[in-house]
A protein has these predicted regions:
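Short glycine-enriched loops at secondary-structure junctions
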Residues: 65, 116-120, 171-172
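Active-site glycine/GP-rich loop and adjacent strand/helix microenvironment
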Residues: 3, 7-10, 134-414
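Short, acidic Gly/Pro/Ser/Thr-rich loop/turn segments
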Residues: 78, 119-121, 271-274
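Short, charged beta->alpha transition segments
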Residues: 65-67, 125, 151-154
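Short active-site-adjacent helix-start/loop capping segments
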Residues: 30, 80, 120-123, 175
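Glycine-rich, histidine-containing beta strand-loop boundary motifs that form or position
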Residues: 83-85, 115, 169-170, 221
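Conserved AMP-binding loop of ANL adenylate-forming enzymes
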Residues: 97-132, 144
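Nucleotide 5′-phosphate-binding alpha/beta core
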Residues: 1-70, 75-109, 160-167, 189, ...
Length: 414
């Protein structure tokens, strides 16, 4: 890991103008000393997304030879991160190695993957959006699952597909178990592993999943910006994937530590096209260095706490609005309008049965507000069941106001 970190710091200090400028502005005397580097914020990545390319990679961006990873997550600040394809696949290898080592899961095993990507999809009642490509991967759109009938259709799809493992969010896993139990349906006999991603895994959902499916379950902590960050071993320790990332934490005292509790500060060790050095991931973690190897044999540091990731839902007349769908609305609009939305949040007013989308546009783009608001509204209803009685509105959002400093994707007010 240390060798890969040194190589990354050498690259950014010699082949990346964005970081060379940061070195000069922060009077960094040793470019290979990570401790001297300042924290990189999501806002900085958002504002400099076309200026962070290493030498030779901007031309690849314009010729569409880079892989784009979009992230808005639970932060409310959307960012794009670009990768060379070879770097992206190298970044996924550490996780695949651990899957094979711990649970016997390989790239050719049949997998059901629940995704939140809902671009260019108009929802129709009881229609399930999925693709089966490559042949061993069934990808199901989870942001457009609104009711029990649609979940039942997914159960039927899974049965016919005969998967070996699920890659699934706890929010969806809980609904899936409930559907199986409600309709007295047996889970697929081929299933032998579940991997939960995207949010916190509550202990009750973990217990229910293991009891119902009778398989091994592991939690994976990762992000679109970094790929895998930490992975749970059979002894329930979340080990850092040290061949992919270097993790620190920003404490409440403002110091950056290699151990302790605070905001996750992550350096990617594989992305040479658009390096992220000391990137503030935003999640609250507890980071522990092991004094002796874990019983699984892994000596890597352990993340024992992850806070700040929770997806909520509103159920209106039997239909479900979840934050995955809301986040994807913003993602699709940003894809259309070239990242015009810089900040967002949703507020549901229970007494008014009204959902409000608050957005903040890039500088000098406020003249586009009405057009963007209209498109958000149309897109929202395309992805919902039209029979639902709900008021929906789009209003301006000031991310700098005192009341908006604590962010959540979906806030519910009485």
């Amino acid at each position: 890991m240390q060798n890969k970190l040194t190589k990354m710091l050498n690259l950014v200090s010699t082949e990346n103008d964005f970081y060379k400028d940061r070195l000069e502005k922060n009077a960094i005397s040793c470019s290979l000393d990570l401790d001297q580097y300042p924290i990189l914020t999501r806002k900085e990545v958002q504002e400099n997304r076309y200026n962070m390319f290493s030498f030779g990679c901007k031309s690849k961006f314009f010729s569409q030879q880079l892989r784009r990873q979009y992230s808005s997550g639970s932060s409310g600040t959307p960012v794009n991160v670009y990768w060379l394809y070879k770097d992206y696949y190298a970044s996924t290898l550490p996780l695949w190695r651990q899957r094979a080592r711990y649970y016997g899961i390989h790239t050719n095993d049949r997998m059901v993957k629940f995704t939140m990507n809902a671009y260019n999809i108009t929802h129709e009642n009881n229609t399930i959006h999925y693709i089966n490509d490559p042949n061993n991967v069934l990808t199901i759109n989870a942001s457009l699952i609104h009711n029990e009938d649609e979940m039942l259709e997914i159960v039927k799809l899974i049965k016919n597909f005969e998967p070996v493992w699920f890659y699934i969010q706890p929010f969806i896993l809980n609904r899936l178990i409930r559907c199986y139990q409600t309709h007295n349906i047996c889970p697929p006999a081929t299933l032998r592993y579940i991997e939960t991603v995207g949010e916190l895994l509550p202990s009750d959902i973990r217990r229910r999943a293991i009891e119902f499916f009778g398989v091994r379950l592991a939690n994976m902590y990762g992000t679109e910006e970094m790929n895998g960050i930490a992975y749970e071993c059979p002894h329930h320790s979340m080990h850092i994937l040290t061949d992919n990332v270097f993790v620190e934490c920003l404490t409440t005292e403002g110091t950056i530590e290699r151990e302790g509790q605070g905001q996750a500060i992550v350096t990617n060790l594989n992305n040479t096209a658009m390096p992220l050095v000391r990137y503030n991931q935003g999640d609250i973690i507890s980071l522990t260095n092991q004094t002796s190897p874990c019983p699984c044999g892994n000596c890597a540091p352990i993340i024992s706490l992850i806070e700040g990731r929770k997806m909520d839902e509103i159920i209106i007349e039997g239909a479900t609005i979840n934050t995955y769908l809301l986040v994807e609305l913003i993602a699709e609009l940003n894809n259309t309008y070239n990242d015009i939305i810089t900040d967002f949040k949703f507020v549901y007013h229970n007494s008014l049965n009204m959902l409000v989308c608050y957005i903040h546009l890039t500088d000098n783009k406020n003249m586009w507000f009405e057009s963007v608001a209209e498109d958000i509204t149309q897109l929202f209803w395309k992805k919902q069941e039209t029979k639902m009685e709900l008021r929906f509105d789009v209003l301006p959002f000031d991310p700098n106001t005192e009341t908006n400093k604590k962010f959540c994707v979906l806030e519910v007010k009485e």
